[in-house]
Amino acid sequence: MSTERRASSNPMTNEENAMFLDILHEAPLFGHRKSRSLVGSYLYMLLLAGYAILAAGAPWMFHRVQQLTPSLLCCCDVALLVVTGVFQQYFVYQVQKIRLQGYYSFSQKLKHVVRLPFAIAAYGTAAMLLVIVWRPQIHILSISSLQRIIMLVEAVGAGFFMGLYIGYVHQYNSVNSRPDVLKSLYSPLQPSSSMEGLRYYEGRLSDQQTALLQYQRENLHFLSEEILCLQEKLSKYEQSDDGSTPQVDLAHLLAARDQELRTLSAEMNQLQSELRLARSLIAERDAEVQRVNSTNNQYIEENERLRAILSEWSMRAANLERALEVERMSNSELQKEVASTRRKQMLETTTSEQP
């Protein structure tokens, strides 16, 4: 029966739906949404990195006071707990700012994440206390080793959740959607099934309505400031129009606008002169490039001509080498013939001289 009553109350005209849906386009704070700073998160991450380095290098850092190493590590752990508590208050303040900006889902995600580093530090401090109390009965590892392990686990766990926080805040800074808290204004007015209608009876609806009221209060505060500023300006201009006060503000405003216009015109003239100078320099560079290209073409033609001459002289040298080789061969043949004729003459003279 309750489902039927809800179903009978759901049908609405398009005009009535649009009356509530138009609220999405009437969020003044959306155009003035401020990004959340991550400087504190990065500082806390650097602190955790230094804490992890201290835990890893404690035997070398405290080698001169080894008997005081457990006490010093406990002091460092307590200091981390205190600093984490301070940073947690800062992170909770940032999450509240995100909630007041109308981003309910981001604030719900971050609300649980920002408290986990302090919880991890508190659990680590409790574990450190148990190690100190049960020191006589612990024989597996040394006390300093157990303390260093606890410190490393604290640093890694807190760093992991702080990385999640940084990722969510970075996503919030880069998001460009409307505030999701406004959905609670019109979502119950839309037709829904019986199972979907049950979600409005959860405790989350009251939290969403509270966030919506806070967001609307911020919108009203912002609009009040804008209205006061506009009323102040209007009163100044009305007084100047009545003649009760001179139009000093208007004249000052016009003079300021005139000065800005002159400044802009001077900057524009300077930019135009610089542009003309740049164009002249570009023209000179183009002419120089053309001259270099023409000179390069001449060098290429001269190189081609020299290559042709070199090839011609190479052919001539080859012909001369061949002719020289032929001449050498003919000369060697002549020398052989001369030698043979001399031997014949010597033989003839020797035969003629014999009786």
Swiss-Prot record:
Keyword Coiled coil appears in the UniProt entry: yes
Topology of the protein relative to the lipid bilayer: Multi-pass membrane protein
Phenotype on disruption: No visible phenotype under normal growth conditions.
GO cellular component, one term: membrane
Primary localization class, coarse: membrane
Region (Disordered) residue spans: 331-355
Residue runs in coiled coils: 220-337
Transmembrane segments: 42-62, 72-92, 113-133, 149-169
Stretches with biased composition (Basic and acidic residues): 331-340
UniProt-annotated location(s): Membrane
Keywords: Coiled coil, Membrane, Transmembrane, Transmembrane helix
Family statement: Belongs to the TMEM192 family.
Subunit structure comment from the entry: Interacts with FRI.
Protein name per its UniProtKB record: Protein FIP1
Species this chain originates from: Arabidopsis thaliana
